[in-house]
Amino acid sequence: MSNVSIKLLREGAKLPVRGSAFAAGYDLYACLDGDKELIIPPHATAMLPTGLSFALPEGTFGAVVARSGLASKQGLRPANCLGVIDSDYRGECFVALHNDSNEERTVRHGDRVAQLVLLPFLPMEFEQVNTLPETVRGEGGFGSTGR
């Protein structure tokens, strides 16, 4: 098991926690000043502080993804669908939470608002070429493999 250094930036910030021993995601909690709550209007986005900053291992990034129950039951999900925390970023982690529902949603201090999944990535350089290798699929686009 690897260790990730986390700095608590706000009073009341909570460390990420897995929901089960085999869960891939670690719950991220809203850290609102003074136990406040935040109302997110229908079809609007709010920036929620977590009160955390990370030193993620080199060669990884943090993927901020939706919590399945929050998205399916309340219509709340990360606005960018998948947020990226780069391993060299040291600022506070915020969750841009979007309300897809037609009703106001309330987020309270300590609510679980997203999950953090640590993933590896492959550093690469792009090489411009005049031709690409042929494949069976070729240039078949949207829906071309579905029947």
Language model features by range: what are they?
Residues 1-147:
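DUTPase catalytic domain/fold
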